[in-house]
Regions:
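Generic alpha-helical secondary structure
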Residues: 3-10, 83, 87
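Walker B catalytic acidic pair
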Residues: 93
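PRPP/pyrophosphate-binding module of the type I phosphoribosyltransferase fold
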Residues: 90
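Active-site scaffold of zinc-dependent metalloenzymes
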Residues: 42-87, 97-123
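Zn2+-dependent metallopeptidase catalytic core
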Residues: 9-26
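Propeptide-to-catalytic entry region of secreted or membrane-anchored zinc metalloproteases
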Residues: 2-5, 22-40
Length: 124
């Protein structure tokens, strides 16, 4: 899937989320061409697919096309796989946003536990 095709798909997906999810998301959702390997893992093992950001620029969601493309090539994704991964990542980042508005950290803690288990698996 090309960058433009992924962007079009992401636009269609974003329109399906409830309006309430966009409360205070003043920076919106951006698809960037970057590949973001996670520096805490061996090369090619883990990629950052998306991020929820809350900083001086505002609140916004970034998705990294290059990371999706790297995994798609490695795992031989179909178009359905692209759709599933983009949707799951967007929903995940929206959850971070909504939890952040509520002062909750449940998904942050779950993410930390997931990454810790990967580290343990790689370095038994």
């Amino acid at each position: 899937m090309t960058f433009d095709e992924a962007g079009d798909l992401l636009d269609r997906m974003a329109e399906k989320f409830p309006e309430e999810f966009y409360a205070d998301l003043n920076g919106g959702i951006s698809l960037l061409p970057d590949e973001m390997p996670d520096p805490e893992f061996p090369p090619g093992e883990m990629y950052i697919l998306g991020e929820y950001c809350d900083d001086q620029m505002g609140k916004y969601i970034l998705l990294y096309y290059g990371s999706f493309a790297a995994l798609a090539a490695k795992e031989e994704w179909t178009e359905a796989d692209w759709e599933e991964e983009l949707y799951a990542t967007l929903a995940h980042e929206f959850t971070h946003h909504i939890e952040g508005l509520a002062g909750e950290r449940g998904l942050d803690l779950k993410d930390e536990a997931f990454l810790e288990s990967w580290h343990e698996e790689l370095d038994p």
